[in-house]
Regions:
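Juxtamembrane intracellular "pre-TM" segments in multi-pass secondary transporters
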Residues: 6-32, 216-247
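Helix-loop boundary and gating motifs at the non-cytosolic
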Residues: 23-78, 243-269, 276-279
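Central cavity-lining transmembrane alpha-helices of secondary-active solute carriers
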Residues: 72-90, 281-294
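Symmetry-related core transmembrane helices of the 12-TM Major Facilitator Superfamily/SLC fold
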Residues: 195-214, 401-418
Length: 425
């Protein structure tokens, strides 16, 4: 009788214990939850950042700032925003601690609404630079964490695609905060701008809450293991990563900056000012949709080919689509310009999804923070060099000069893509 009871108790115990399949499903659900939390963080964060970005120039101008001062401030901010990413990536790899940098970086967004509480230009400049430094601190470790979460049966492409889509929703909604304030108050003076900044306080609170929740779930259930294995040795940084960085430089250098497109459409009278901003918003929507589609395609290619680096095949979309942007967006036709900006949105979505996903498939996790830091610096340098060159060429030779420049740069990117694809197989 005792033996029979023991067998029954053991059977009940085994039934009560969750199966390995159930545990795996539970882990995947937690990962999806964290990925969605990070998506909300990106969305809310961009509401704060892009909202302020749409108003900073006008607000500083009302307080007496010069164009030279704004140019130097923005240039310095972008320099810190990209250069320090290499430092933060290196720190998180050396220490194995990603979350302090992520939380501190997003926490720095609190300085943005505080910009509405002062009219001192020196203080405002300091707050602006703190926000840029905060973004540099958080981006490499955040991307590193997301890249490993994506390996939990979700897919790197779709994870970064979802992040970009929600990011663009925030980028679209952010400026609407100030637009709503202006429409409601019927004013565009200093007080109106300060009210707009004040409305960003609760959004910052949502950012912090979402980040802390993500941190709690990841650390409690150990969803990210420091020093976990990543790509295989034959697909590591020493073999392919430098070649990928060369591709990144030329691909980003060949992307026409929207500032040049907007300048052309305005100076040539192709479309009205309101239509320019509307088309830019449409391009951001296209960006969000393209990010999801190309991200999913990236994962599908990897699964079908059965090789970790197979997703790199989708990189061909970047040089192919980038070449068409100047010939459409810098034309004299409103319809062609609209098509060009839609193509511009596709390129941006691919940049933010596939190019970031590829880092995860080319590097081991313990070096991924540094890899993302290097990627961001190279990307920023390429975009800066390309935009500067295209601006000079447009002033001297107009749209044809920019088109020729893009052709050369993206042709180089395509040749590097071919070599990269061969090395990755």
């Amino acid at each position: 009788m005792t033996n029979r009871q023991s067998v029954v108790d053991q059977a009940r115990s085994e039934q009560a214990r969750p199966s390995s399949a159930q545990c795996a499903q539970s882990a995947v659900r937690r990962v999806v939850f964290v990925v969605l939390l990070f998506g909300l963080v990106s969305c809310f964060g961009d509401i704060v950042y892009e909202g302020a970005r749409s108003a900073n120039g006008q607000y500083f101008s009302l307080l007496g700032a010069s164009a030279t001062m704004m140019g130097i401030l923005y240039g310095t901010g972008e320099f810190f925003g990209y250069a320090l990413r290499l430092v933060s990536g290196r720190i998180c790899d050396e220490t194995g601690r990603h979350w302090p940098l992520i939380i501190a970086g997003y926490g720095s967004l609190i300085v943005v609404p505080f910009m509405g509480l002062t009219t001192n230009l020196g203080v405002l400049c300091a707050l602006f630079l703190i926000e840029r430094i905060g973004k540099a601190l958080r981006n490499p470790p955040k991307d590193a964490v997301l890249s490993q979460l994506s390996e939990k049966k979700i897919g790197t492409g779709i994870v970064f695609g979802l992040q970009e889509a929600l990011d663009q929703i925030g980028a679209f909604a952010g400026p609407m905060v100030f637009t709503a304030v202006f429409l409601e108050s019927g004013r565009t003076d200093v007080a109106a701008y300060q009210l707009g900044y004040a409305w960003l306080f609760p959004v910052v609170a949502l950012v912090v809450i979402a980040v802390v929740c993500a941190w709690r779930v990841v650390t409690r259930f150990k969803l990210v293991e420091e020093g976990a294995a990543g790509a295989s040795k034959d697909a590591g940084p020493a073999a392919i990563f430098p070649l990928y960085m060369a591709f990144t430089f030329f691909a980003s250098a060949g992307l026409v900056a929207f500032s040049i497109i907007g300048f052309h459409l305005k100076s040539r009278g192709v479309i009205a000012d309101g239509a320019i901003t509307t088309l830019y918003s449409v391009a951001m929507i296209v960006d969000a949709i393209a990010a999801l589609v190309i991200g999913r395609l990236y994962d599908v290619v990897k699964v079908r080919v059965g090789k970790r680096t197979a997703g790199l095949k989708t990189l061909f979309v970047i040089p192919l689509c980038s070449i068409g942007v100047p010939f459409l967006a810098l034309s004299e036709s409103a319809w062609l310009a609209a098509a060009g900006l839609a193509l511009y949105g596709i390129v941006l979505g691919t940049h933010e999804t596939v190019m970031r996903s590829a880092i995860a498939d080319l590097t081991v996790f313990r070096k991924r923070g540094t890899a993302y830091g290097i990627f961001n610096v190279v990307y920023g340098l390429g975009f800066f060099a390309g935009s500067s060159l295209m601006g000079i060429l447009y002033d001297h030779w107009g749209s044809p000069g920019v088109g020729a420049c893009v052709l050369v740069l993206e042709a180089a990117a395509f040749l590097l893509f071919i070599r990269l694809n061969r090395r990755a197989q």
